């Protein structure tokens, strides 16, 4: 697993929140166009790489900053005020990074991935839902097929957000072909490990820049890429709580920005009406 070292922005003398604000400024510039065209926010995500936001949770010993959930939620809130799509992409990515950090220690392959993620600021997507399972992420149809020191996986993913733009995918799967649907594992896949065949288009309302679509995911790699800890523990301890904290921070940021826009609109209308507020507008200008 080769590592490409990213240039350090100001030797990381700025805080995570200060860097997030700079990324938010880039994201805000393209936010309307991104949502209108359902296009990936390339400039904003590149800015997140440059300002080293994608690897903030990686422990210091693996080249990261040892960022906390508080850092992630502040980051997501800040980005949410600027561009909903950028913020949600970062939130989903950070949820997967949290799983890697908390459940990948002690596994040589996953520790090497942490080092690479910190160095290259890789972007990770996730594959958690399937055609047969709908939105139930605690039930998998596709199974990991082990072959000596390797594995293969064929998965009908109902939706993968920014799957074609990501550097890797974290996927859920059944532990084996004869395992129960709820006996699941988490697998870290690099771009060279898989192919994606688009099977379903999503015409989403909002957050269109997440580029969410259905795919047939065909993957193969080393058995070391499968997390040793069972997914039920990862789901309960990390995946669900971090996802909900990150997503809700994004939504809070979106809501705060919407209120600000409403306030500006009402104040402009009031100035044009000699200071008279529109009906029902007083609570927006408190």
Report residues per predicted region.
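A short core secondary-structure module
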Residues: 159-196
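Alpha-helical interface subdomain recognition
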Residues: 2-58, 64-74, 249-286
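Short beta-alpha junctions and helix-cap segments that line functional grooves
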Residues: 156, 199-202
